[in-house]
Amino acid sequence: SRALSPSLNDPYTAMAVLEHLGDALCFLRDRGLPNGRYERNGRLLLFMPVSDFQGLVETMLNLIRQYGRTHPAVMIRLIEVLTEVCACLDDARRRDVLKLHATLARDEGLEHTWAQHDREAIERRYERFLRADAQRNGKRAEEPVIVEHHE
């Protein structure tokens, strides 16, 4: 693998980046994203392809998940961050995108993790994600959702 410096290739950097990405996704909450159409007086001036929420999440998380899959701490933190973001979102479709990425993190983490304790920790985090998603269904974002990640 390549990096600008060896310090950028460690799991701690990945986990710190995940914190910031999670904060950014919570900041977006259920805000609309630009549609790429720029008009004036009803006349189309410019159309630019833009990403939707799913594309944004894929861009943010795919490489970290792919390169971090051999580090249980990265997979655990990824699922924890997705759980925290899930608790922010009203939009069930956006939560489904997060669920896909939580499932990928769980599956890939389990595939590359041999220590039983780490495998159990990954499973526990995934179960917490599922509980947070189930709890969010039918609730507005103003209602509290309990997200725990003590260990």
Give the ranges of each region predicted by the language model.
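Short basic (Lys/Arg) and small-residue
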Residues: 1-151
